A protein has these predicted regions:
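Charged DNA-binding/catalytic regions of mobile-element recombinases
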Residues: 1-201
């Protein structure tokens, strides 16, 4: 009705037999609060709660024999730290619940868990999240920007690791990602010294 404006709404009310002035209609229209841009609201939510937000997601990795493996991970928003990851051939809701149980054995400092509309995140998974004190928060459909921290980590993992090495199997992929996560946790000063030593050699 906002697109019609006061004159049109006034005309419709007259047709229905309501005798009100156009000025009264305009006055009440101005009182309707306008909702902000969805992107702005979501950004504000992420900024206000970043220390209490964790996100989980899947990404697929083909192996040397063209099998598809699914890598599940949980990432902390504030420090962009991987809290947990695991690899499987067939992810199921029960498997995801077990992964979350490994990460969140009890009440923790986190309040919100972001995840997309993957069918694996069903009622059992969201029920477990609620039981551990997490508020399950689904992102919009086809809106990867709403879980940008997780999507960025996947992109970095592909670019810096998986685009250069082909995983042989499930165990090999787990070992590769474990080494990559350990590398990311290495202090920057140590990484720089390693680079300098490599340049000297």
């Amino acid at each position: 009705m906002r697109t019609g404006g006061a004159p049109r709404i006034h005309g419709e009310l007259l047709k229905l037999g309501f005798d009100v002035s156009e000025r009264s209609v305009a006055r009440y229209l101005r009182r309707v609060p306008r909702r902000g841009d969805p992107a702005t609201r979501w950004s504000a939510f992420l900024a206000n709660h970043r220390e209490a937000i964790v996100a989980c997601d899947f990404f697929t990795v083909p192996t040397l024999t063209f099998q598809l493996l699914s890598c599940f991970f949980v990432i902390e928003h504030h420090r962009r730290k991987i809290l947990h990851f695991n690899v499987t051939r067939e992810p199921t809701p029960a498997w995801v619940v077990q992964q979350l149980r490994d990460v969140f054995p009890g009440d923790g400092p986190y309040r919100f868990m972001l995840f997309d509309h993957d069918s694996t995140f069903d009622g059992h998974v969201t029920g477990f999240m609620k039981a551990t004190g997490l508020d399950p928060t689904r992102t919009g459909i086809q809106a990867p920007w709403q879980n940008g921290i997780a999507e960025r980590w996947v992109r970095s993992c592909r670019r810096e690791l998986l685009d250069s090495i082909i995983a042989l199997n499930e165990r090999h992929l787990s070992r590769l990602i474990r080494a990559y996560v350990a590398y990311l946790l290495t202090p920057v000063s140590t990484k720089l010294s390693q680079l300098r030593c490599r340049d000297i050699l």
